[in-house]
């Protein structure tokens, strides 16, 4: 190496350059990405280690004894009929009187799975994104869908813009009542709706087996409306009474399964209230509302009304009828009828409820019906039984309409 005097600038010769380039020093291993970002088992934080095993001398946790069955009350009033005995004599007993259901084992927390939120694809930039939230109101059997906004939608019109709206569809189900839509916003690719659409009559069973399809479309006055993009949310991903917010990328149209059995297609649902009034000495039947009714008219709607009978009807005087609601598949009635009858005789009776489509100049069309009483099963039997066991208490339940009722008169 060349020696330098004090005050001189350090210089490096070509030979020294060669030595530095050829012999850079000891070779060290190149660090990998995993050295900077260590891997951990899914779901564990970096500082989490294996759980410590319980010490062998730790006392065992005592098992919780199951609660014994409640015996029926021995001090019933003499003037009240023994409803359980009557059900045993005239029909099937639904089992123990309604009480707190046995505690279910705690559900395992779902794994953290990536929602549509940070998802990115080619469709994300081509079709746009959609922000919305879903809430299942378990007490009122309602699914609230709030459509907030969309961003970066695909241009559909000649001016480079679109006239977007959002359409909801519950799958499976082909009924027009299963479809809801927002208003249309004109000439925008970044619409803000802040609009809430609600499905009524949604049960816990629906939340397990149904999927909500959300489509963004472009409205065209002179041609068919055009599809922009969609997303689908299995309702089982929602927790009851908990709002879940989504920000997703729209996808191309997915095929709808049309192989589902048409015989299982629902005719609609009806919300009925029952109450035995001690003051009026009679059964109060409330027809509250219907939801998702089958369309019977050419315009895709129905003109529904409801009839009720208390069977057997020897005198043929038990018929009651609501008002007709025009051009709707989700009518609200809020009407109540009273049947004067002794409490003890109700266990021998059945309540027949039928929904009809009103037509001018021709016979009315049967939409669907339901029978509550001693010969019913499931929720229909339980609703009737709960009414008889709880005098002066209004009990409200949703019931699925069927296309056939055993022994019922299906002509108006």
Swiss-Prot record:
Residues 126-250, 266-399 form the C2 domain. One of its GO terms (molecular function) is calcium-dependent phospholipid binding. Ca(2+) 2 binds at residues 297, 303, 357, 359. The modification Phosphoserine is found at residue 411. It is found in: Cytoplasm; Cytoplasmic granule; Cell membrane. Ca(2+) 3 binds at residues 297, 357, 359, 365. Residues 49-70 have a biased composition (Low complexity). GO terms for biological process: calcium ion-regulated exocytosis of neurotransmitter; calcium-dependent activation of synaptic vesicle fusion; positive regulation of calcium ion-dependent exocytosis; positive regulation of insulin secretion; positive regulation of vesicle fusion; protein localization; spontaneous neurotransmitter secretion. Its main location: cytoplasm. It is a peripheral membrane protein. SUPFAM superfamilies: C2 domain (Calcium/lipid-binding domain, CaLB). Residues 95-108 have a biased composition (Pro residues). Widely expressed with highest levels in brain and kidney. Expressed in pancreatic islet cells (at protein level). SMART domains: C2. Residues 1-90 are annotated as: Mediates interaction with DYNLT1. Residues 112-123 have a biased composition (Acidic residues). Residues 1-36 are annotated as: Negatively regulates targeting to plasma membrane. One of its GO terms (cellular component) is presynapse. Its cofactor is Ca(2+). Calcium sensor which positively regulates SNARE-dependent fusion of vesicles with membranes. Binds phospholipids in a calcium-dependent manner and may act at the priming stage of fusion by modifying membrane curvature to stimulate fusion. Involved in calcium-triggered exocytosis in chromaffin cells and calcium-dependent spontaneous release of neurotransmitter in absence of action potentials in neuronal cells. Involved both in glucose-stimulated insulin secretion in pancreatic cells and insulin-dependent GLUT4 transport to the plasma membrane in adipocytes. This is Double C2-like domain-containing protein beta. It comes from Homo sapiens.
């Amino acid at each position: 190496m060349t020696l330098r005097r004090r005050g001189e600038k350090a210089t490096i010769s070509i030979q020294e350059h060669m030595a530095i380039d050829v012999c850079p020093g000891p070779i060290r291993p190149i660090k990998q990405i995993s050295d900077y970002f260590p891997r951990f088992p899914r779901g564990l934080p970096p500082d989490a280690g294996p759980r410590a095993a319980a010490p062998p001398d730790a006392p065992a946790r005592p098992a919780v004894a199951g609660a014994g069955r409640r015996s029926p009350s021995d001090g019933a009033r003499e003037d009240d009929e023994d409803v359980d005995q009557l059900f045993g004599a005239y029909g099937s007993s639904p089992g123990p009187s309604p009480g707190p259901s046995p505690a279910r084992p705690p559900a395992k927390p779902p794994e953290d799975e990536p929602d549509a939120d940070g998802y990115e694809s080619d469709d994300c930039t081509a079709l746009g994104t959609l922000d919305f939230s879903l809430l299942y109101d378990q007490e009122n059997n309602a699914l609230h869908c709030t459509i907030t906004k969309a961003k970066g939608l695909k241009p559909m019109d000649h001016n480079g813009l679109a006239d977007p709206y959002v359409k909801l569809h519950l799958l499976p189900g082909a009924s027009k009542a299963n479809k809801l839509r927002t208003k249309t916003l004109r000439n925008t690719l970044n619409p803000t709706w802040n609009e809430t659409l609600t499905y009524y009559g949604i049960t816990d069973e629906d939340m397990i087996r149904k999927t909500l399809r959300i489509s963004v479309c472009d409205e065209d006055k002179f041609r068919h409306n055009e599809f922009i993009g969609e997303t689908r949310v299995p309702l089982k991903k929602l927790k009851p009474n908990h709002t879940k917010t989504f920000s997703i990328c729209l996808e191309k149209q997915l095929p709808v399964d049309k192989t589902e059995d048409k015989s299982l297609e629902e005719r609609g649902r009806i919300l009925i209230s029952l109450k035995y009034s001690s003051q009026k000495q009679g059964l109060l039947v409330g027809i509250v509302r219907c939801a998702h009714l089958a369309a019977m008219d050419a315009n895709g709607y129905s003109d529904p009304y409801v009839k009720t009978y208390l069977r057997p009807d020897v005198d043929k005087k038990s018929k009651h009828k609501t008002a007709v609601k025009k051009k709707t598949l989700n009518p609200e009635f809020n009407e109540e009828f009273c049947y004067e009858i002794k409490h003890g005789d109700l266990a021998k009776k059945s309540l027949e409820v039928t929904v009809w489509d009103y037509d001018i100049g021709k016979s009315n069309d049967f939409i669907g019906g339901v029978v509550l009483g001693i010969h019913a099963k499931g929720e229909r039997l339980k609703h009737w039984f709960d009414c008889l066991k709880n005098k002066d208490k209004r009990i409200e339940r949703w019931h699925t309409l069927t296309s056939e009722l055993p022994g019922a008169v299906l002509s108006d």
